[in-house]
């Protein structure tokens, strides 16, 4: 049996050994919920890696967005290079869900652009769970969305061995049954090709290798792994398990029953709509569903097959859907990273999905069973937890209430202590801030400034720029990739001060920042509550000169609690350093580029900006105008009128420059 083997140049330091011991003791004692309260920069991921190695259990790590999941996946891959570390997030680069807007009688068809690489990683994740136990899957909240039945998925695996008696047509039929398609010309994932007695299969979970099956009569003579590009043999195999090309795969016998069940539901719903006087809706539903039924009958698949998943799996109405968690064995471990963000996100998924789908059902676009293709309700998610570790610097009320044990990780391996916090009056705050910024820039350090309003952020940025400070403003309209580029430029010293409203999102791991200034700190509410203040203050905790200045004329309860908690941690850290003769050191961290797996389709073509329009040739401008006009029409068609207007303005600018 494969075991988790942790490989690292680090050893457990500070509070890490105690945290690992206490978490393992709690888990081995049978507790379902425990929390790792680890301060920023204390090495929480390394602690979790040590817990996983000690427990030797398949582990699901849930993060609250794709970017954070990709970062965690990269870190776990470094810690466990010999084990299966997988990545499971939504495979859509672009996703426009099916929707109906009654007010304008507008039906928006589902439109999506699937990232083939991420789809491959999803298949790799589910197949790994059936092949081994040393598996860590890092997932976004996509893991609570509907998937096909794990039993069906497992039973439909095509298992082939050397010496097995199986004729060619039987193997080909088996491949077609699990959603592989024959393509002798374009050999891609999820396809197979045939040349005489040689069958080559490109499994859904592979990237650059395929499986070649050589027959002698009705017997499998040889199985080899080949390079898909060159056809070079990479290795001999005695056995190969080919997993289905779709997570929604059903045997023919079950498919026939599902079609009957869909027809029955269609008949009932048509009667109901007619009684309600909805003749148009009834006709629409009949046409759409009958078309899908024909596709299922002939091809075994249809567009939007997930909306019939309840029938295909044979689940009763209202029952919870299968999801990634069902693919794990019973003794699995769950880790919820940044739980103060992730738990509320999981809690809110069901309601948003339900309101959109109910409109589709009410107006004859979908059968009521489509409502059962949904994310888990929060209560369903709770029931699926075996044993869970919540990881956060500021655990939310849910984690605090449910955890049988809260383990603190306050001491950082670097010896860094939480920053000193000072409250200063509002009067003269801008001049005071300017003076503090100059002190930092003289030492080649960086500054974060957080405000409460967009206008104040813009005005402050303009003022500091006029005063000769190299400053940037980060607002909510900037997408993830651009945010990460701004953060990278800050770390590289291309500018010194970053102003923003919500500077709590992922990626703000900045050892160069030695000052965090919080304006309007005494305005109680969102972004000025205790948890947000502690998170914001923590941004200065990776630099040995870290300091926090709050500007406010009063000290609110949230400020007091945040300052008291930070001071409590700081005292503990200083005492530990003195006892062990540790000198704090600023975190040394490479400036990484954005992880490629999370790049979205929009990043593949650089947008034209006023700066680079002047550099284009006439031919380049003409080609770009044609491309942007297509995008503008598409945006208008999808009711994205703001985007269409932006594209129109850009086209006009390009035409003017010609």
Curated annotation (Swiss-Prot):
Domain Helicase ATP-binding stretches: 25-182
Residues bound to ATP: 38-45
Entries under SMART domains matching the protein: DEXDc, HELICc
The UniProt record lists the keyword Heme: no
GO MF annotations in UniProt: ATP binding; ATP hydrolysis activity; DNA binding; excinuclease ABC activity; helicase activity
Pfam families, A to Z: Helicase_C (PF00271), ResIII (PF04851), UVR (PF02151), UvrB (PF12344), UvrB_inter (PF17757)
Residue ranges annotated for the Helicase C-terminal domain, each copy included: 429-595
Keyword Amino-acid biosynthesis in record: no
Residues of the UVR domain: 622-657
Compartments, as annotated in UniProt: Cytoplasm
Domain commentary: The beta-hairpin motif is involved in DNA binding.
Name recorded for this polypeptide: UvrABC system protein B
Higher taxonomy: Bacteria, Bacillati, Bacillota, Clostridia, Natranaerobiales
Gene: uvrB
């Amino acid at each position: 049996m494969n075991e988790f083997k942790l490989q690292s140049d680090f050893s457990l330091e500070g509070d890490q050994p105690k945290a690992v011991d206490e978490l393992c003791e709690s888990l081995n004692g049978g507790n379902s919920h425990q929390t790792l309260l680890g301060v920023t920069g204390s090495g929480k991921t390394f602690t979790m890696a040590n817990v996983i190695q000690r427990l030797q259990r398949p582990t699901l790590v849930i993060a609250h967005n794709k970017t954070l999941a990709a970062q965690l996946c990269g870190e776990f891959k470094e810690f466990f290079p010999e084990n299966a570390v997988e990545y499971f997030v939504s495979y859509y680069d672009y996703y426009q869900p099916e929707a109906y807007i009654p007010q304008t009688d507008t039906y928006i068809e589902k439109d999506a652009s699937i990232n083939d690489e991420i789809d491959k990683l999803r298949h790799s994740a589910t197949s790994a769970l059936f092949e081994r136990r040393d598996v860590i899957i890092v997932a976004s909240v996509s893991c609570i969305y509907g998937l096909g039945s794990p039993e069906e998925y497992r039973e439909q695996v095509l298992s082939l061995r050397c010496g097995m008696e199986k004729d060619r047509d039987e193997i080909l039929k088996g491949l077609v049954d699990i959603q592989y398609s024959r393509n002798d010309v374009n050999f891609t994932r999820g396809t197979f090709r045939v040349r005489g007695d040689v069958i080559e299969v490109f499994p859904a979970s592979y990237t650059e290798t395929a499986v070649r099956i050589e027959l002698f009569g009705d017997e499998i003579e040889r199985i080899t792994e080949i390079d898909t590009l060159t056809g070079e043999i990479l290795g001999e195999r005695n056995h190969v398990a080919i997993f289905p090309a779709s997570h929604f795969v059903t045997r023919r016998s079950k498919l026939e029953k599902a079609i009957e069940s869909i027809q029955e539901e269609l008949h009932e719903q048509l009667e109901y709509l007619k009684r309600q006087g909805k003749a148009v809706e009834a006709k629409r539903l009949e046409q759409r569903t009958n078309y899908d039924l024909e596709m299922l009958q002939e091809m075994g698949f249809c567009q939007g097959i997930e909306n019939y998943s309840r029938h295909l799996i044979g689940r009763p109405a209202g029952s919870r859907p299968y999801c990634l968690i069902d693919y794990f064995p019973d003794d699995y471990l769950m880790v919820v990273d940044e739980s103060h963000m992730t738990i509320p996100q999981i809690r809110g998924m069901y309601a948003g999905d339900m309101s959109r789908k109910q409109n589709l059902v009410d107006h004859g676009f979908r059968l009521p069973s489509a409502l059962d293709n949904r994310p888990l309700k929060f209560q369903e998610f709770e029931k699926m937890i075996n044993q869970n570790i919540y990881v956060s610097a500021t655990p939310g009320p849910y984690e605090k209430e449910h955890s049988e044990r809260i383990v603190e990780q306050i001491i950082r391996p670097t010896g860094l202590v939480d920053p000193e916090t000072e409250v200063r009056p509002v009067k003269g705050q801008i001049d005071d801030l300017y003076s503090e910024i100059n002190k930092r820039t003289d030492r080649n350090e960086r500054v974060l400034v957080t405000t409460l309003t967009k206008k104040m952020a813009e005005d402050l940025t303009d003022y500091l720029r006029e005063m000769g400070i190299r400053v940037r403003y980060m607002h909510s309209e900037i997408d993830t990739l651009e945010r990460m580029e701004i953060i990278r430029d800050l770390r590289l010293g291309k500018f010194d001060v970053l102003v923003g409203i919500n500077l709590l999102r992922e990626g703000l791991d900045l050892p160069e920042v030695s000052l965090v200034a919080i304006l309007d700190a005494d305005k109680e509410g969102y972004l000025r509550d205790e948890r947000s203040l502690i998170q914001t203050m923590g941004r200065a905790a990776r630099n040995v000169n870290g300091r926090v200045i709050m500007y406010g004329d009063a000290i609110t309860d949230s400020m007091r609690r945040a300052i008291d908690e930070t001071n409590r941690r700081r005292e503990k850290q200083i005492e530990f350093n003195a006892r062990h003769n540790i000198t704090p050191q600023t975190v040394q961290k490479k400036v990484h580029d954005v992880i490629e797996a999370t790049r979205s389709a929009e990043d593949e073509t650089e947008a034209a900006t006023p700066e680079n329009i002047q550099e284009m040739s006439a031919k380049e401008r003409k080609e770009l105008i044609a491309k942007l006009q297509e995008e503008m029409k598409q945006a208008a068609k999808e009711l994205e009128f703001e985007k269409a207007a932006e594209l129109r303005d850009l086209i006009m600018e390009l035409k003017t420059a010609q």
